[in-house]
């Protein structure tokens, strides 16, 4: 454990094309092996496809998708007297954004479309319409928290 406390959060620069921090975070989640320009090409291509299919601002579509994917509750393991309980806890706002982006990207990778641009675009569109694997993951997470509500008094 570090003695100086938690590392400070570095400021996030706005995206040069859309002027949105959310797009920057999405680019960083898509990023593999330090290939930032490739990640940007994938994200911008996906957002452009989303614009063509919906006819609306892609950042608005992305935000709507994020609102549908962001979890408000999750379960954390807590050991009490030799038993491990799944304790439901509220998710911090920054963690909910991180989880939503992680789920969007990971479930787009698992899709069947040909290119990553198409996969990401379709996952964002599905999520903005309340469909898709990322939204299902959020619902499963909430269901799990609801099922373990009896252990909520073990929160820390």
UniProtKB/Swiss-Prot annotation:
One of its GO terms (cellular component) is small ribosomal subunit. InterPro entries: Ribosomal_uS7, Ribosomal_uS7_bac/org-type, Ribosomal_uS7_CS, Ribosomal_uS7_dom, Ribosomal_uS7_dom_sf. GO terms for molecular function: rRNA binding; structural constituent of ribosome; tRNA binding. Coiled coil: none annotated. Keywords: Ribonucleoprotein, Ribosomal protein, RNA-binding, rRNA-binding, tRNA-binding. GO terms for biological process: translation. Disulfide bonds: none annotated. SUPFAM superfamilies: Ribosomal protein S7. PANTHER family: RIBOSOMAL PROTEIN S7. One of the primary rRNA binding proteins, it binds directly to 16S rRNA where it nucleates assembly of the head domain of the 30S subunit. Is located at the subunit interface close to the decoding center, probably blocks exit of the E-site tRNA. Part of the 30S ribosomal subunit. Contacts proteins S9 and S11. Belongs to the universal ribosomal protein uS7 family. This is Small ribosomal subunit protein uS7. It comes from Mycolicibacterium vanbaalenii (strain DSM 7251 / JCM 13017 / BCRC 16820 / KCTC 9966 / NRRL B-24157 / PYR-1). The gene is rpsG.
